[in-house]
């Protein structure tokens, strides 16, 4: 296969291995790779961590302010977008609560689905490059068959122009995502 690769870290990976150590290893591997390699911060938990990733050479950053109020999520996301813009580093944001548990993230029971109108306003006010939405996916293992709110996803797609991201979709059957 000649597919591009995305190497990503979460805040718990950074805490365990250290950002500089991890990045040095990934950069060494990327230099030897015969395909493009992106280095992504997943679920960046703070402005400070996002800036550390930006300074050390990450090629894309996710700031996850979904645990904050709507206005605070907008504020932290816009701050990260503004800081990344001069370097043309794309910023993914999250709106809504993706259920389940992964690393130190606890999305609860997944009942905080993304509201389409809030998604439109959020993207307009922040300038995020992509938006992770909550439509029924969950981090970690599924207890039963995932039930995705396809209609909600369609409604969000109609009012949001940036790419939409589904976290927790690795346990979702391919046909449910198509």
Set out the residue ranges of the language-model regions.
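Structured beta-strand/loop patches that form or line metal/cofactor-binding pockets in enzymes
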Residues: 169
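Metal-cofactor-binding active-site regions of metalloenzymes
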Residues: 17
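Alpha/beta enzyme core
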Residues: 1-8, 12, 20-36, 44-166, ...
């Amino acid at each position: 296969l000649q597919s591009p690769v995305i190497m990503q870290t979460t805040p718990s990976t950074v805490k365990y291995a250290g950002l500089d150590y991890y990045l040095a290893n990934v950069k060494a591997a990327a230099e030897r790779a015969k395909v493009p390699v992106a280095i992504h911060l997943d679920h960046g938990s703070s402005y400070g961590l996002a800036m550390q990733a930006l300074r050390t050479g990450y090629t894309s950053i996710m700031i996850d302010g979904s645990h904050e109020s709507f206005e605070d999520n907008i504020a932290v996301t816009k701050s990260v977008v503004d800081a990344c813009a001069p370097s043309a580093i794309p910023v993914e944001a999250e709106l809504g609560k993706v259920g389940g548990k992964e690393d130190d993230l606890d999305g609860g029971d997944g009942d905080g689905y993304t509201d389409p109108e809030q998604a439109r306003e959020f993207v307009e006010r922040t300038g995020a490059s992509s938006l992770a939405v909550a439509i029924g996916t969950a981090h970690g293992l599924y207890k039963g068959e995932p039930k995705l709110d396809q209609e909600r996803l369609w409604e969000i797609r109609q009012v949001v122009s940036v790419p939409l991201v589904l976290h927790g979709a690795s346990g979702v059957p391919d046909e449910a995502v198509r």
